[in-house]
Curated annotation (Swiss-Prot):
Activity regulation text: FtsK is required for recombination.
Domain of life: Bacteria
Gene assigned in the entry: xerS
Record NCBIfam families: PRK05084.1
Cellular location(s): Cytoplasm
HAMAP family hit by this protein: Recomb_XerS
GO molecular function, one term: DNA binding
Species lineage: Bacteria, Bacillati, Bacillota, Bacilli, Lactobacillales
Record protein name field: Tyrosine recombinase XerS
Length: 356
């Protein structure tokens, strides 16, 4: 979603929110949470607050009128009723006969609510230096995680990774072969953004940064001489990330054409730009997701930018056998989340041995 449209939608949601949600929003901007994250959270709050009205838990007409005391006095049974509502409500405008949202969506909703309740009961201060209330019902609500072993997850994921030579082959396919099947109109659009698209995909494959970290890069954040980028990690922490050398020519080619191709001025600080009606803007995450899906589906299998992050992590672990190094590269505080890559690499090694 374009940044301007995203901000418009955020403003629309803010207009209907209670004052304490607006305070939460303002507080998280300073962390900083991304606008995309805050937009998703606001949508979850609207859904929850509307349910409070519809179910009669809150006795008012508009969600902006819901008092803090309603949240303070929510019971575990109330939250269980809300979760049941999510599980059973019909899906609207969906190409499915299934009722209810997925467990992943429910977990995301509960995570957003946990963040709000933690703010209200622990982080915010009233005039006396105390939180607005102390009773946090979300601490009594447990989430149900998808049951899947690491081995099973590794097996599912590795089919969507570009391991070994496929990393370079994917980039070369976009560079040299993808255009051969395009119409004249599609070819013109491809040629306009070819260097940028290759630079973004090469960077994701060569650094393992998150999509949000990549699109939020500014021109000053990249140093091609030492192949390092400075990113803002989750929680607002700044980090320097090494970039594999194979991405250098793609990044250099893009930087050579960036100013003239996208009509960039000094005030256009974003590294990766798009252009609409002659005006350059920071490229948005949605555009990158669609771009990665388009190229990857034509090459091998449709993947997300996050699978490119998995690809880098798996290749790095395969080369170093160091979970610590991989966790540092990905910006994780713990090596626990890198266990997945050991399973993927071990499976690859077993397959190689079976061919001997």
């Amino acid at each position: 979603m374009k940044r301007e449209l995203l901000l418009e939608k955020i403003d629309e949601l803010k207009e209907i929110m209670p004052w304490y949600v607006l305070e939460y929003y303002q507080s998280k901007l300073s962390v900083p949470y991304s606008f995309t994250t805050l937009y998703e959270y606001l949508k979850e709050y609207r859904r929850f607050l509307e349910w409070l009205l519809d179910s009669g838990v809150a006795n008012c007409h508009h969600i902006a009128e819901i008092e803090l005391s309603v949240l303070e006095n929510l019971t575990k049974k109330d939250m269980e009723a809300f979760i049941l509502y999510l599980r059973e409500r019909p899906l609207l405008n969906a190409n499915t006969r299934q009722n209810g949202v997925s467990q992943t969506t429910i977990n995301r909703t509960l995570s957003a609510l946990s963040s709000l309740f933690k703010y209200l009961t622990e982080e915010v201060e009233n005039a006396d230096g105390e939180p607005y209330f102390y009773r946090n019902v979300m601490k009594k609500v447990s989430t149900k995680k998808k049951k899947e072993t690491l081995a099973s997850r590794a097996e599912n994921i590795k089919q969507k990774l570009f391991l070994g030579n496929e990393t370079i082959e994917f980039l070369e396919y976009i560079d040299c072969e993808y255009q051969n099947k395009l119409s004249k109109r599609a070819l013109a659009f491809f040629n306009k953004n070819k260097e940028r698209d290759l630079a973004i995909i090469a960077l994701l494959l060569a650094s393992g940064v998150r999509l949000s970290e990549a699109v939020n890069l500014d021109l000053k954040d990249i140093n091609l001489n030492v192949m390092v980028i400075d990113v803002t990690r989750k929680g607002g922490k700044r980090d320097s990330v090494n970039v594999a050398s194979f991405a250098k020519p793609y990044l250099a080619n893009y930087l050579d054409i960036r100013k003239n191709r996208y009509k960039a001025e000094n005030q256009d600080i974003a590294l990766f730009l798009s252009e609409y009606r002659g005006v350059p803007n920071r490229i948005d995450a949605s555009s990158v997701e669609k771009m990665v899906a388009k190229y990857s589906q034509d090459f091998k299998v449709r993947v997300t930018p996050h699978k490119l992050r998995h690809t880098l992590a798996t290749r790095l672990y395969d080369a170093t056998k160091s979970q610590v190094l991989v966790s540092h590269q990905l910006g994780h505080a713990s090596t626990q989340v890198t266990d997945l890559y050991t399973h993927i690499v071990n499976d690859e090694q077993k397959n190689a041995l079976d061919k001997l």
